[in-house]
Amino acid sequence: MHGAPKYPAGFTHFNYADPNAPKGGRVVLGQTGSFDTLNPLIIRGEPVAGIREWVYETLMARGFDEPFTMYGLVAKSVEMPPDRSSVTFHIDPAARFSDGKPITADDVIFSMETLRERGRPNHRNSYKKVVRTDRVSDLAVRFVFDASGDREMPLIMASMPVLPKHLLTPETFERTTLAPIVGSGPYTIAAIDAGRSITYKRNPDYWGRDLPVNRGRYNFDEIRYEYFRDMSVQFEAFKSGVLDVRTEDDPKLWASGYDIPARRDGRVLTREIETGLPAGMSALAFNTRRPVFQDPRVRRGLLLLFNFEWVNKTLYHGLYKRTESFFERSYLSSAGRPADARERELLAPFPDAVLPEVMEGRYRMPVSDGTGHNRENAREAFRLFSEAGYVIDGGRLVHKDTREPLGFEILAGSSVQQRLIASYVSDLAKLGIAARLRVVDSSQYQSRLKDYDYDMIQTAWPSSLSPGNEQVFRWDSRNADVPGSFNFVGVKNPAVDAMINRLLEAEGDEDFTSAVRALDRVLLSGHYVIPLFHASRQWVANWKQVQGPKTFSLWGYNLDTWWIDGQK
């Protein structure tokens, strides 16, 4: 999309994959919660882990060591005019579903039309920009795009999963199902224990095993996901050897939980993996659809009352860094950078959308002295609450006109979130704010998330160096009231919409970077979330028979490039 591909025509394999990696063995991974469907492409149900990665294939494969390039997979070649107004995919004649049926243009067209009409909101939003579909031949399809100028659309279509038309109808597609799904990917479904586990088996007849994008990947004969009721039980399963690999996101466990005999004698390995990706945004997210959070002064005040320095020291062994941007840890971040001329031009039609300190690069998350008091930030927070109409009455913060207390519920879907949220709730209670924590099971949490039935949640929006149409799904006004979107906050901001459009229209690296930074500034100025923290590296633990490559991609840990060492 921007720049030149990293790999030339005729390349043999991705640099982060070892073409000599041995095949064989089984790897077992852990998941928390449960599942009730094998279909991850619809909004209904709680999908099982792994279908998208192991069973379905997309038209083209992403290169994980560059942000804007995809290479041939189901589509052997692609044609595109300079203005990116259309894209033509030429299907590899060898491409097959796991039942042996060839993949044809009819499967590709069926996939697009079905996902556009009945898929998840992100598919519906993106594929509706296809205004015409041409069946060029049995093995070629052309998609023609609308006049919106979205230059990412060829990559969006290249990322589309290909569904078997001979096994599905639009009606059967949108049902939740536990019947094994047929795809064209490297694995098939070998066993299902509803809600408890799923096992994938490497397909010995996989049509694409020798493609350059696949060499050195998909090395395990079996991949099994075991489900556990909570993270603590899952961690015990790893320590006892039931699970083979674990990605850790709990600093307390990383700091001390892996001091076990198996690690001390070398049977368990821990590693910290560098990643070239932005850290993304992990945050406490306000549901601005709720009246209590519609005043940005209230949101800013609550942000000021989050005592990161104390939380990091007390709960997380000081292992986290504060997140200052939606594109933290990358050149796309606006933090500490004054807006350039391009950004100012983009933002000029929205003079009130960005705070002066954000525009000038002076904005920072509030800092405390690391004690449990946070007095200076509390004084500024109460000034903002007062401006918003709140007063102290009998030790409670209430609105001076309605007498409604400043109070809300923070919804959590796992016990892991309880420590942080309970700490924040306790701090707010000392200041007369009636926050409360509610923990529900995974199924109920996902259901309430889809319907925006919460006041506040702890959530995360991952990021990459190629932000695009996923930003529409997260922040655009059109998705604020669409069930199942990732616009958890309910953002309805014309400046946000405009900046997303500009990043999608950008033709060069500089224009793209300026548009992303401008979007970052508008989101930060809106105080839609309380930014939390991030680790500087990925934390991965594994039993030593599971081995990984010496070179990692920008994305860091990718299980599909690991293997079993039979000697260990």
Please state what every model-predicted region is:
Residues 1-83, 90, 113, 180-182:
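N-terminal lobe/hinge region of extracytoplasmic solute-binding protein
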Residues 17-22, 42-50, 77-121, 136, ...:
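Aromatic- and charge-enriched surface segment that lines or borders ligand/interaction sites
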Residues 56-66, 113, 157-217, 221-224, ...:
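Gly/Pro-rich hinge or "lid" segments in bacterial periplasmic/extracellular proteins
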Residues 13-14, 33-50, 74, 101, ...:
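A structural "hinge/loop" feature
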Residues 90, 125-168, 184-193, 338-353:
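Surface-exposed binding/hinge segments that line
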Residues 31-33, 47-50, 54, 193-198, ...:
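Detector for C-terminal structural segments
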